[in-house]
């Protein structure tokens, strides 16, 4: 099954300046992500960036770059610019791999593409079970609730679903009811084109979750349980230290 990986790599970061280029055991982080994408079997891999230094690092590693504007408000908007510049057909399967996930398993990159290709839906993503209370109550861990067919009902930073009977008695155990959303998406290129024509929704502003725009406009997102749990992403200097140790 043919698919394209696009890796948005925005240079500016308030918590970790120049994040795509931070060194992880002798390589820029963006190159590690590029290598994971290559292992997935993608037909084409494009790094979308707004910074020449990132472009040079990717090209030095033999990767393809698409220079994008610096004023995009979301990764999906950056993807849309690449889709137009590369003139992808509407049925092209695009996988958005975050540029700060150097430990993402190649298997789940392909999994999200396969899941999308097997369904008549414009967008697909992945989740993993939550087994501990700390993660269930952490607003930085985005939770997702599914319907009987595996389509998202809602994404939230809140603890959903709220296990009323359990939590009245005990906030230390969470049972088997929670899923943490992973920030990897598969789209058809035509769906990306439609997405960026929609006005941002009130819910996405409240939660700061751009995927809520899709649900707001009545579209479906398929969510599968990931075949592998990805390693730590890099948002902070502490994350970077942890990833360097894990990848040593």
Swiss-Prot record:
Give its localization. Cytoplasm
* EC main group: transferase
Q: Where is it predominantly found?
A: cytoplasm
Provide the GO biological process annotations. Answer: CMP-keto-3-deoxy-D-manno-octulosonic acid biosynthetic process; lipopolysaccharide biosynthetic process
- Does Cytoplasm appear among the keywords? yes
List its EC numbers.
2.7.7.38
Question: What reaction is this protein's catalytic activity?
Answer: 3-deoxy-alpha-D-manno-oct-2-ulosonate + CTP = CMP-3-deoxy-beta-D-manno-octulosonate + diphosphate
- Give, as in the UniProt entry, the pathway in which the protein acts: Nucleotide-sugar biosynthesis; CMP-3-deoxy-D-manno-octulosonate biosynthesis; CMP-3-deoxy-D-manno-octulosonate from 3-deoxy-D-manno-octulosonate and CTP: step 1/1; Bacterial outer membrane biogenesis; lipopolysaccharide biosynthesis
* Annotated GO MF terms: 3-deoxy-manno-octulosonate cytidylyltransferase activity
- Pfam families found in the cross-reference section: CTP_transf_3
Keywords of this protein's UniProt record, alphabetized?
Cytoplasm, Lipopolysaccharide biosynthesis, Nucleotidyltransferase, Transferase
Q: What cellular component GO annotations does this protein have?
A: cytosol
User: Looking at the keywords, is Transmembrane present?
Assistant: no
What is the similarity comment for this entry?
Answer: Belongs to the KdsB family.
Q: Could you tell me what this protein does? A: Activates KDO (a required 8-carbon sugar) for incorporation into bacterial lipopolysaccharide in Gram-negative bacteria.
Q: In its UniProt entry, what is this protein called?
A: 3-deoxy-manno-octulosonate cytidylyltransferase
- Please give the organism: Escherichia coli O127:H6 (strain E2348/69 / EPEC)
Its organism's taxonomic lineage begins at: Bacteria, Pseudomonadati, Pseudomonadota, Gammaproteobacteria, Enterobacterales
Q: Which gene encodes it?
A: kdsB
């Amino acid at each position: 099954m043919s698919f394209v990986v696009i890796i948005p790599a925005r240079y500016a970061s308030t918590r970790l300046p120049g994040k795509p280029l931070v060194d992880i055991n002798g390589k820029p982080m963006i190159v590690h992500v590029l290598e994971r994408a290559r292992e997935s079997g993608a037909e084409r891999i494009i790094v979308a960036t707004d910074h020449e230094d990132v472009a040079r690092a990717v090209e030095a590693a033999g990767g393809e770059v698409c220079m994008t504007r610096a004023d995009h408000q979301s990764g999906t908007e950056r993807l849309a610019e690449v889709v137009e510049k590369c003139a992808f057909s509407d049925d092209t399967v695009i996988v958005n791999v975050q540029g700060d996930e150097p430990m993402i398993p190649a298997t789940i990159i392909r999994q999200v593409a396969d899941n999308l290709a097997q369904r008549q839906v414009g967008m697909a993503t992945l989740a993993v079970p939550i087994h501990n209370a700390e993660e269930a109550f952490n607003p930085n861990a985005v939770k997702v609730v599914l319907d009987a067919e595996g389509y998202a009902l809602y994404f939230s930073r809140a603890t959903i679903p709220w296990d009323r009977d359990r939590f009245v008695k005990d906030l230390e155990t969470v049972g088997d009811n929670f899923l943490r959303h992973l920030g990897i998406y598969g789209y058809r290129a035509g769906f990306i084109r439609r997405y960026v024509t929609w006005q941002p929704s009130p819910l996405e502003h409240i939660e700061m979750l751009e995927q809520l725009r899709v649900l707001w406009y009545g579209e479906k997102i398929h969510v599968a349980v990931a075949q592998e749990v990805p390693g730590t992403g890099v948002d902070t200097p502490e994350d970077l230290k942890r990833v360097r140790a894990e990848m040593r």
